[in-house]
Protein backbone atom coordinates (compact mmCIF):
# COMPACT_ATOMS: atom_id res chain seq x y z
CA UNK A 1 0.00 0.00 0.00
CA UNK A 2 1.77 3.11 -1.21
CA UNK A 3 1.06 6.62 0.10
CA UNK A 4 1.72 8.20 -3.31
CA UNK A 5 -1.69 7.43 -4.81
CA UNK A 6 -3.94 10.42 -5.31
CA UNK A 7 -7.68 10.70 -5.52
CA UNK A 8 -7.32 12.04 -9.08
CA UNK A 9 -5.51 8.99 -10.43
CA UNK A 10 -8.07 6.35 -11.27
CA UNK A 11 -7.40 2.70 -10.57
CA UNK A 12 -5.80 0.52 -13.25
CA UNK A 13 -7.86 -2.27 -14.80
CA UNK A 14 -5.03 -4.82 -15.08
CA UNK A 15 -4.76 -6.15 -11.47
CA UNK A 16 -8.49 -6.85 -11.27
CA UNK A 17 -8.65 -8.46 -14.71
CA UNK A 18 -5.65 -10.67 -13.93
CA UNK A 19 -7.15 -11.73 -10.59
CA UNK A 20 -10.45 -12.64 -12.28
CA UNK A 21 -8.67 -14.65 -14.97
CA UNK A 22 -6.60 -16.49 -12.35
CA UNK A 23 -9.79 -17.35 -10.49
CA UNK A 24 -11.46 -18.60 -13.67
CA UNK A 25 -8.36 -20.59 -14.58
CA UNK A 26 -8.31 -22.27 -11.17
CA UNK A 27 -11.97 -23.24 -11.56
CA UNK A 28 -11.12 -24.99 -14.84
CA UNK A 29 -8.50 -27.08 -13.04
CA UNK A 30 -10.77 -28.24 -10.23
CA UNK A 31 -11.79 -31.93 -10.24
CA UNK A 32 -15.41 -32.76 -10.97
CA UNK A 33 -15.87 -34.11 -7.42
CA UNK A 34 -15.94 -30.58 -5.99
CA UNK A 35 -18.05 -28.96 -8.71
CA UNK A 36 -21.82 -28.52 -8.80
CA UNK A 37 -21.81 -27.99 -12.58
CA UNK A 38 -19.43 -28.54 -15.55
CA UNK A 39 -16.04 -26.89 -15.12
CA UNK A 40 -16.53 -24.61 -18.14
CA UNK A 41 -19.71 -22.90 -16.90
CA UNK A 42 -18.18 -20.37 -14.48
CA UNK A 43 -15.22 -19.47 -16.75
CA UNK A 44 -17.53 -18.84 -19.71
CA UNK A 45 -19.93 -16.71 -17.66
CA UNK A 46 -17.02 -14.88 -16.06
CA UNK A 47 -15.42 -14.02 -19.41
CA UNK A 48 -18.78 -12.87 -20.80
CA UNK A 49 -19.12 -10.48 -17.86
CA UNK A 50 -15.48 -9.35 -17.93
CA UNK A 51 -15.27 -8.47 -21.64
CA UNK A 52 -17.78 -5.56 -21.64
CA UNK A 53 -16.16 -4.17 -18.49
CA UNK A 54 -12.72 -4.18 -20.13
CA UNK A 55 -14.14 -2.60 -23.30
CA UNK A 56 -15.90 0.10 -21.25
CA UNK A 57 -12.80 0.91 -19.15
CA UNK A 58 -9.84 -0.68 -20.95
CA UNK A 59 -6.99 0.94 -19.00
CA UNK A 60 -8.22 2.84 -15.96
CA UNK A 61 -11.56 2.79 -14.16
CA UNK A 62 -12.65 6.30 -15.06
CA UNK A 63 -16.29 5.78 -16.05
CA UNK A 64 -19.29 4.11 -14.48
CA UNK A 65 -22.93 3.67 -15.48
CA UNK A 66 -25.77 1.74 -13.92
CA UNK A 67 -25.24 -1.22 -16.23
CA UNK A 68 -21.47 -1.32 -15.76
CA UNK A 69 -21.92 -1.19 -11.99
CA UNK A 70 -24.36 -4.10 -12.09
CA UNK A 71 -22.16 -6.16 -14.43
CA UNK A 72 -19.09 -5.56 -12.28
CA UNK A 73 -20.87 -6.48 -9.07
CA UNK A 74 -22.48 -9.51 -10.75
CA UNK A 75 -19.02 -10.77 -11.69
CA UNK A 76 -17.89 -10.54 -8.06
CA UNK A 77 -21.04 -12.33 -6.88
CA UNK A 78 -20.66 -15.05 -9.54
CA UNK A 79 -17.10 -15.84 -8.48
CA UNK A 80 -17.99 -15.76 -4.78
CA UNK A 81 -21.07 -17.99 -5.04
CA UNK A 82 -19.28 -20.48 -7.30
CA UNK A 83 -16.35 -20.50 -4.89
CA UNK A 84 -18.53 -21.12 -1.85
CA UNK A 85 -20.32 -24.00 -3.56
CA UNK A 86 -16.89 -25.47 -4.27
CA UNK A 87 -15.88 -24.94 -0.64
CA UNK A 88 -18.91 -26.98 0.47
CA UNK A 89 -18.00 -29.83 -1.88
CA UNK A 90 -14.34 -29.71 -0.85
CA UNK A 91 -15.31 -29.96 2.81
CA UNK A 92 -17.50 -32.97 1.97
CA UNK A 93 -14.57 -34.64 0.19
CA UNK A 94 -12.22 -33.91 3.09
CA UNK A 95 -14.71 -35.33 5.59
CA UNK A 96 -15.34 -38.39 3.44
CA UNK A 97 -11.68 -39.38 3.33
CA UNK A 98 -12.18 -41.36 0.12
CA UNK A 99 -10.22 -39.27 -2.40
CA UNK A 100 -6.47 -39.37 -2.99
CA UNK A 101 -4.74 -37.42 -0.23
CA UNK A 102 -2.35 -35.37 -2.35
CA UNK A 103 -5.01 -34.51 -4.91
CA UNK A 104 -7.55 -33.33 -2.36
CA UNK A 105 -4.96 -31.15 -0.60
CA UNK A 106 -4.06 -29.53 -3.93
CA UNK A 107 -7.76 -28.95 -4.57
CA UNK A 108 -8.14 -27.34 -1.16
CA UNK A 109 -5.24 -25.00 -1.97
CA UNK A 110 -6.88 -23.99 -5.25
CA UNK A 111 -10.16 -23.32 -3.46
CA UNK A 112 -8.35 -21.33 -0.75
CA UNK A 113 -6.69 -19.05 -3.32
CA UNK A 114 -9.98 -18.63 -5.21
CA UNK A 115 -11.71 -17.65 -1.98
CA UNK A 116 -9.21 -14.86 -1.36
CA UNK A 117 -9.61 -13.51 -4.90
CA UNK A 118 -13.42 -13.68 -4.81
CA UNK A 119 -13.87 -12.02 -1.42
CA UNK A 120 -11.27 -9.41 -2.35
CA UNK A 121 -13.52 -8.52 -5.29
CA UNK A 122 -16.57 -8.30 -3.04
CA UNK A 123 -14.82 -5.95 -0.60
CA UNK A 124 -13.48 -3.90 -3.52
CA UNK A 125 -16.95 -3.51 -5.02
CA UNK A 126 -18.68 -2.91 -1.70
CA UNK A 127 -16.58 -0.22 -0.03
CA UNK A 128 -17.90 3.33 -0.61
CA UNK A 129 -19.79 2.37 -3.75
CA UNK A 130 -16.96 0.74 -5.69
CA UNK A 131 -13.67 1.74 -7.35
CA UNK A 132 -14.99 4.65 -9.43
CA UNK A 133 -17.09 6.19 -6.65
CA UNK A 134 -14.16 6.05 -4.20
CA UNK A 135 -12.31 8.61 -6.33
CA UNK A 136 -15.04 11.19 -5.64
CA UNK A 137 -14.10 13.29 -2.59
CA UNK A 138 -17.67 13.60 -1.32
CA UNK A 139 -18.12 9.81 -1.24
CA UNK A 140 -14.68 9.11 0.20
CA UNK A 141 -15.31 11.39 3.18
CA UNK A 142 -18.86 10.15 3.79
CA UNK A 143 -19.91 8.09 6.80
CA UNK A 144 -20.72 5.09 4.58
CA UNK A 145 -17.22 3.59 4.59
CA UNK A 146 -17.26 -0.20 4.89
CA UNK A 147 -13.53 -0.39 5.69
CA UNK A 148 -11.06 1.91 7.39
CA UNK A 149 -7.46 1.61 6.23
CA UNK A 150 -4.56 2.81 8.43
CA UNK A 151 -3.57 5.39 5.79
CA UNK A 152 -6.85 7.23 6.43
CA UNK A 153 -5.74 8.20 9.93
CA UNK A 154 -2.45 9.74 8.79
CA UNK A 155 -2.59 13.37 7.54
CA UNK A 156 0.47 12.68 5.38
CA UNK A 157 -1.53 10.21 3.27
CA UNK A 158 -4.76 12.21 3.05
CA UNK A 159 -4.97 11.75 -0.73
CA UNK A 160 -4.34 7.99 -0.58
CA UNK A 161 -7.04 5.71 -2.01
CA UNK A 162 -7.18 1.89 -1.84
CA UNK A 163 -6.98 -0.27 -4.96
CA UNK A 164 -7.97 -3.89 -5.56
CA UNK A 165 -4.69 -5.26 -4.20
CA UNK A 166 -5.42 -3.60 -0.86
CA UNK A 167 -8.75 -5.41 -0.63
CA UNK A 168 -7.09 -8.63 -1.79
CA UNK A 169 -4.71 -8.23 1.15
CA UNK A 170 -7.68 -7.73 3.50
CA UNK A 171 -9.24 -10.95 2.20
CA UNK A 172 -5.95 -12.85 2.55
CA UNK A 173 -5.27 -11.74 6.13
CA UNK A 174 -8.86 -12.58 7.05
CA UNK A 175 -8.35 -16.11 5.72
CA UNK A 176 -5.06 -16.53 7.60
CA UNK A 177 -5.75 -14.71 10.88
CA UNK A 178 -9.54 -15.35 10.93
CA UNK A 179 -9.98 -11.71 11.98
CA UNK A 180 -9.22 -8.18 10.76
CA UNK A 181 -5.61 -7.04 11.03
CA UNK A 182 -4.64 -3.49 10.05
CA UNK A 183 -7.88 -2.70 8.17
CA UNK A 184 -11.09 -2.55 10.17
CA UNK A 185 -14.62 -3.35 8.95
CA UNK A 186 -16.87 -0.41 9.82
CA UNK A 187 -20.36 -1.51 8.77
CA UNK A 188 -22.49 -4.47 9.78
CA UNK A 189 -22.48 -5.90 6.25
CA UNK A 190 -18.67 -5.74 6.06
CA UNK A 191 -18.35 -7.42 9.46
CA UNK A 192 -20.80 -10.19 8.54
CA UNK A 193 -19.10 -10.92 5.22
CA UNK A 194 -15.68 -11.02 6.87
CA UNK A 195 -17.02 -13.26 9.64
CA UNK A 196 -18.49 -15.64 7.07
CA UNK A 197 -15.24 -15.73 5.11
CA UNK A 198 -13.17 -16.32 8.26
CA UNK A 199 -15.46 -19.14 9.42
CA UNK A 200 -15.26 -20.90 6.06
CA UNK A 201 -11.50 -20.46 5.96
CA UNK A 202 -11.12 -21.83 9.48
CA UNK A 203 -13.18 -24.95 8.73
CA UNK A 204 -11.32 -25.57 5.47
CA UNK A 205 -7.89 -25.10 7.05
CA UNK A 206 -8.74 -27.29 10.05
CA UNK A 207 -9.85 -30.13 7.77
CA UNK A 208 -6.80 -29.74 5.53
CA UNK A 209 -4.45 -29.93 8.53
CA UNK A 210 -6.30 -32.98 9.84
CA UNK A 211 -6.09 -34.69 6.46
CA UNK A 212 -2.39 -33.83 6.10
CA UNK A 213 -1.66 -35.33 9.53
CA UNK A 214 -3.48 -38.51 8.54
CA UNK A 215 -1.47 -38.74 5.31
CA UNK A 216 1.84 -38.26 7.14
CA UNK A 217 0.97 -40.79 9.84
Regions found by a protein language model. Name each.
Residues 15, 37-49:
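Structural signature of hydrophobic alpha-helical transmembrane segments
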Residues 4-18:
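N-terminal membrane topogenic signal
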Residues 27-40, 59-60:
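Short, hydrophobic transmembrane alpha-helix segments
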Residues 65-77:
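Cytoplasmic-side transmembrane-helix entry/capping segments in multi-pass membrane proteins
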Residues 94-132:
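Pore-domain transmembrane helices of cation channels
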Residues 49-63:
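Canonical alpha-helical transmembrane segments
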Residues 128-183:
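Membrane-proximal soluble regions of multi-pass membrane proteins
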Residues 161-217:
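Pore domain of cation channels
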Amino acid sequence: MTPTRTRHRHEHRAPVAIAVLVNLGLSLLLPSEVLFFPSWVVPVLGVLLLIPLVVFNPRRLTRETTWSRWVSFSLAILLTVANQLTVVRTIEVLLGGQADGGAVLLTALQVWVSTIIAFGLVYWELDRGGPVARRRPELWTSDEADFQFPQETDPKTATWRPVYLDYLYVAMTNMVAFSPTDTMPMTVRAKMIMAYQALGGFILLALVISRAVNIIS
